[in-house]
Amino acid sequence: MIIKPRVRGFICVTTHPAGCAASVREQIAYVARRGPIERGPKKVLVIGASTGYGLAARIAAAFGAGAATLGVFFERAPADAKPGTAGWYNSAAFHDEAAARGLQATSINGDAFSDEIKHKTIDAIRRDLGQVDLVVYSVAAPRRTHPKTGVTHQSTLKPIGHAVRLRGIDTDNEAIKETLLQPATPDEIADTVAVMGGEDWRMWIDALDAAGVLADGAKTTAFTYLGEQVTHDIYWNGSIGEAKKDLDRTVLALRGKLAARGGDARVSVLKAVVTQASSAIPMMPLYLSLLFKVMKARGTHEGCIEQVDGLLRDSLYGAQPHVDAEGRLRADRLELDPAVQTRVLELWDQVTDDNLYTLTDFAGYKAEFLRLFGFGIDGVDYDAPVEPNVRIPNLIE
């Protein structure tokens, strides 16, 4: 079938298998150009492995360090001529490329928050890997059903204590709009922490440790975004910020647990990129469009694979890791360059409907958004029929 993009709000409801595969190959090629990751991991579990930063981590570990990988994700398979999700096709392509290079790859499709998937993961590690020496936690989900209580918690994107008015882009109409966000209630804050805080990461590490499948010297990292002044009302001072602070508290306990056996636990702070999650946040399309404009002009623009490949080489397995005062690994230094942030702030209130395409790189933002779903990738013939029914080898469901 011929598949074209169909966008509704912040979601593209179609995906292109060949485009997703080409995107994965592009990321693999980037890692290969940079050469082997010295002293890198050899047996890696990535929780949230099918898109964005999690996929990039799996690619960097496998094709940069030669690691065997186990990926956990929650994706929809193709069915009845209806395409699957982008993460499904990304993972299928990853498996194909790994097999072609003799790299061990196993994937598990299911709810990472559940005890069932944790147990399946432990069984798979015992069978295929024995133990893992790196656990990457890269889960972005709007809700979580707690495995012990059965309660489903919904995350909320709201400020705390006062309403906040945000500038943004109505991406459907390509117009500047303002959104008034009301403050979160105590229950909404608690629910957001339950979904996006550190509890599930801790549950994973506790379960893996108790099962004896964490190697001596094992490391774990959870990915997060903090941002700067223009995004702080939402990302640090809001409901999501409370979840990020919970992550910072959680990592201290995990670090103590792993350090006893020569390991480490760190929160890794990555730069703002276009993801399905970030595109749903009212201010982020405008911020990202401005950030792209400024960073591309300076030659410092990076996407997921550049960020995570650099994180592994420079910090997780580098001799001189970039660590902030709170002990987090920082890969977002170029975004937070004062010259970059000053220029973004200067342009922030100047953007109008008329100059959207000149003051910002909204065109680049839209292109990156479509790339998430396999569209706009060089070398792909989008007028040619493509087979949507793609299977993932070594998949556990």
UniProtKB/Swiss-Prot annotation:
<comment type="pathway">
    <text>Lipid metabolism; fatty acid biosynthesis.</text>
</comment>
<feature type="binding site">
    <location>
        <begin position="74"/>
        <end position="75"/>
    </location>
    <ligand>
        <name>NAD(+)</name>
    </ligand>
</feature>
<dbReference type="GO" id="GO:0004318">
    <property type="term" value="F:enoyl-[acyl-carrier-protein] reductase (NADH) activity"/>
</dbReference>
<comment type="function">
    <text>Involved in the final reduction of the elongation cycle of fatty acid synthesis (FAS II). Catalyzes the reduction of a carbon-carbon double bond in an enoyl moiety that is covalently linked to an acyl carrier protein (ACP).</text>
</comment>
<dbReference type="Pfam" id="PF12241">
    <property type="entry name" value="Enoyl_reductase"/>
</dbReference>
<comment type="similarity">
    <text>Belongs to the TER reductase family.</text>
</comment>
<dbReference type="Pfam" id="PF12242">
    <property type="entry name" value="Eno-Rase_NADH_b"/>
</dbReference>
<dbReference type="GO" id="GO:0006633">
    <property type="term" value="P:fatty acid biosynthetic process"/>
</dbReference>
<feature type="binding site">
    <location>
        <begin position="111"/>
        <end position="112"/>
    </location>
    <ligand>
        <name>NAD(+)</name>
    </ligand>
</feature>
<feature type="active site" description="Proton donor">
    <location>
        <position position="235"/>
    </location>
</feature>
<protein>
    <recommendedName>
        <fullName>Enoyl-[acyl-carrier-protein] reductase [NADH]</fullName>
        <ecNumber>1.3.1.9</ecNumber>
    </recommendedName>
</protein>
<dbReference type="InterPro" id="IPR024910">
    <property type="entry name" value="Enoyl-CoA_Rdtase_cat_dom"/>
</dbReference>
<keyword id="KW-0443">Lipid metabolism</keyword>
<dbReference type="InterPro" id="IPR050048">
    <property type="entry name" value="FabV-like_NADH_b"/>
</dbReference>
<keyword id="KW-0275">Fatty acid biosynthesis</keyword>
<comment type="subunit">
    <text>Monomer.</text>
</comment>
<feature type="binding site">
    <location>
        <position position="225"/>
    </location>
    <ligand>
        <name>substrate</name>
    </ligand>
</feature>
<keyword id="KW-0276">Fatty acid metabolism</keyword>
<dbReference type="GO" id="GO:0050343">
    <property type="term" value="F:trans-2-enoyl-CoA reductase (NADH) activity"/>
</dbReference>
<feature type="site" description="Plays an important role in discriminating NADH against NADPH">
    <location>
        <position position="75"/>
    </location>
</feature>
<feature type="binding site">
    <location>
        <begin position="273"/>
        <end position="275"/>
    </location>
    <ligand>
        <name>NAD(+)</name>
    </ligand>
</feature>
<keyword id="KW-0520">NAD</keyword>
<feature type="binding site">
    <location>
        <position position="244"/>
    </location>
    <ligand>
        <name>NAD(+)</name>
    </ligand>
</feature>
<feature type="binding site">
    <location>
        <begin position="139"/>
        <end position="140"/>
    </location>
    <ligand>
        <name>NAD(+)</name>
    </ligand>
</feature>
<dbReference type="InterPro" id="IPR010758">
    <property type="entry name" value="Trans-2-enoyl-CoA_reductase"/>
</dbReference>
<feature type="binding site">
    <location>
        <begin position="48"/>
        <end position="53"/>
    </location>
    <ligand>
        <name>NAD(+)</name>
    </ligand>
</feature>
<dbReference type="GO" id="GO:0051287">
    <property type="term" value="F:NAD binding"/>
</dbReference>
<keyword id="KW-0444">Lipid biosynthesis</keyword>
<keyword id="KW-0560">Oxidoreductase</keyword>
<dbReference type="InterPro" id="IPR024906">
    <property type="entry name" value="Eno_Rdtase_FAD-bd_dom"/>
</dbReference>
<dbReference type="Pfam" id="PF07055">
    <property type="entry name" value="Eno-Rase_FAD_bd"/>
</dbReference>
